[in-house]
Amino acid sequence: MLKSLLAIGLGAMVGAWLRWGLGMKLNALFPAVPPGTLLANLIGGYIIGLAIAFFSASPSLSPEWRLLLITGFCGGLTTFSTFSAEVVSLIQEGRILWALGSIALHVSGSLLMTAAGLATFYFISGR
């Protein structure tokens, strides 16, 4: 149990630091749809896709690796709550089309990046 908690905690810490850094560097560039938040979700979607395929193909790996990468790192990196707050802020400002665009970018982009991560693994591994 302790190994699992440490794996999740370490992954979450690194993922959250990366998300914070992306937000600090990029969000001011385009406040209507903050690119740091979007990039965090897209990167996280891609990594999750790769990880799901990799861990499915590697069942002998310790489960702590999955916890570290998927639950911890990607959980700390991706940010549904920040995305939700940004969309609500756009709606409150009367910028409905920007809010809808942000929703479309985050949701479709994350799903496409997850599929791309899966496809990348299958392409590289020849499966």
UniProtKB/Swiss-Prot annotation:
GO terms for biological process: cellular detoxification of fluoride. InterPro entries: FluC (IPR003691). The keyword Cell inner membrane applies. The keyword Cell membrane applies. One of its GO terms (molecular function) is metal ion binding. It is a multi-pass membrane protein. It is found in: Cell inner membrane. It catalyses: fluoride(in) = fluoride(out). Na(+) is not transported, but it plays an essential structural role and its presence is essential for fluoride channel function. Fluoride-specific ion channel. Important for reducing fluoride concentration in the cell, thus reducing its toxicity. This is Fluoride-specific ion channel FluC. The gene is fluC.
